[in-house]
């Protein structure tokens, strides 16, 4: 009969082997993704642009109960966009019952003459018939034709609903005219001056364009530093490999992206019943043969300065990821192989779930190995050493990337070093454990069909001084 101590040892060995295999799987997926080629927008081609190469662009600005200061900072950056006059529009799209935000926008119109406002009515308004008619005629709008919410007009009150109404309303007004590009940003997103120029260059070769993002307030608090790290690792480093010459399913990032209006119309606009619209619309475009191009110059945004607000934001991301990888993949006709590729985008993030077991049993295995009483097979030690080596190398490459990207928003080297110190390897292990909270809440939201109300991330105009310094505004 096996003694209690022996039983515990067997259990710990099994847990160690299992977690190391899972870590290795996550590492192999990451290696696969990072080996994919990057399709960049080549900004040196600006000199080749002819007057007829500049498409019309409409930048939608969905807002909900935003601070006037936050919106002013964004509009300061928009005022410095370089693009031929008359070829781009900035259209704010608040809900018609958001009276305080509308009043702020009216005041800001006196300061920024390029700003237009389109108020989004309730879905009971007759003007929504433009959307219902378009969806009824388009089989690509599978959510309208299939499932428990088929022809349900009571769309959830969130950013996606605002984008849907604004896009279809504008497209109806422009019917018969030339095509245009659809661009949208968040309330705090501050594009660089060449943002629209990059679109004019890239759309000649690609169907969808996505700019990178970077947090401007990355040193405000420890929470802000860790939240900004997610963007450093994902938006700024890994995401661009999803371009991959069209071989890899992709998501979009929810701001700083460009679609052709004709493509967005043909493919059904935005899915209203998913917590965040970004992953599904990218997966839908890829399923229909559209290629993604990456814009290096990032938008500056602010990240939450408290862990509570960060968890609120990230649980919505997670719910949207799971939702997009479920019913939509089947409705879009993804093959088994394509579904696996789509899931590969998320699986490395799910490795955070391994840490509560993997870290302590890893420490136990190290102790047994050092003490000379290790019961583990040699191959498991080799696998563990390989995992640690890959982790260290990936951290070195990531820190190099972070050092380069922090120069975009931090002037002083000591501030950049301070950020690296806050994101040291031990801190990242702790952050990985914290991430389990939004992963779990987001998973529950997905299972319970939640996330249909816009839980906005609080914006506090954190980048006011940075944007004014960059744009030389007083």
Whereabouts are the PLM-identified features?
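Juxtamembrane C-terminal module of membrane proteins
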Residues: 26-56, 330-343, 371-474
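Catalytic donor-sugar/metal-binding loop of nucleotide-sugar-dependent glycosyltransferases
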Residues: 283-300
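Short, well-formed alpha-helical segments that are part of the catalytic scaffolds
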Residues: 67-80, 98-104
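Short beta-strand-to-loop acidic/aromatic patch adjacent to the donor-nucleotide binding site
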Residues: 176-190
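Long helical/loop segments within the catalytic core of UDP-sugar-dependent glycosyltransferases
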Residues: 127-176, 193-274, 311, 315-326, ...
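A conserved acidic beta->alpha catalytic loop
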Residues: 94-108, 121-129
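N-proximal low-complexity "stem/linker" segments adjacent to membrane-targeting elements
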Residues: 1-76
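Short, acidic, metal-binding catalytic loop of nucleotide-sugar glycosyltransferases
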Residues: 74-87, 110-111
